């Protein structure tokens, strides 16, 4: 990757997206560096958008594993990513987007109209089932089937765009 960045150093560019010529599922996004995904898998489009969320917006994965190999996020430290929290410094995250009286943790939404938009504090994110929270029941940073980023991720991406354009 360093060679690619060096090669592009004299050319004005905004972001690197690398498409691998394979139908194997996968991808990765390194914040402030690049997006990598496979070009011929049926889930290419949602995966490249998800990985772009990491590499451009600094967004965290909002999914959790049944058995995380080791906690990536200690529960007594607030993650730097804007879309997950341990509640240590929640006021710096999306607390201002909660409706008054929203319970913490928030029960997952079952109404299809609300699963992508109802901002709360839903447990299970950052690869961990307990102690790490995400802003909505579902989001592009959690599942490939989500049609959009959640409101918290959208706000964060908008702030990043404004940082570079205003």
Task: Place the predicted regions along the sequence by residue.
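Active-site-proximal segment of zinc-dependent metalloprotease catalytic domains
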Residues: 1-67
């Amino acid at each position: 990757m360093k060679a690619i960045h060096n090669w592009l150093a004299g050319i004005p560019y905004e972001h690197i997206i690398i498409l691998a010529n394979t139908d194997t599922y996968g991808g990765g996004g390194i914040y402030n560096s690049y997006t990598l995904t496979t070009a011929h898998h049926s889930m290419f489009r949602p995966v490249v958008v998800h990985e772009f969320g990491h590499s451009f917006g600094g967004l965290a994965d909002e999914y959790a594993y049944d058995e995380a190999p080791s906690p990536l996020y200690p529960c007594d430290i607030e993650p730097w990513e804007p879309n997950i929290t341990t509640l240590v410094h929640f006021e710096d995250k999306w607390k201002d987007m909660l409706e008054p009286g929203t319970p913490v943790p928030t029960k997952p939404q079952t109404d299809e109209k609300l699963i992508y938009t109802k901002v709360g504090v839903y447990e299970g994110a950052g690869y961990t089932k307990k102690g790490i929270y995400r802003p909505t029941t579902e989001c592009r940073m959690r599942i490939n089937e989500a049609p959009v980023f959640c409101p918290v991720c959208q706000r964060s991406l908008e702030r990043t765009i404004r940082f570079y354009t205003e």
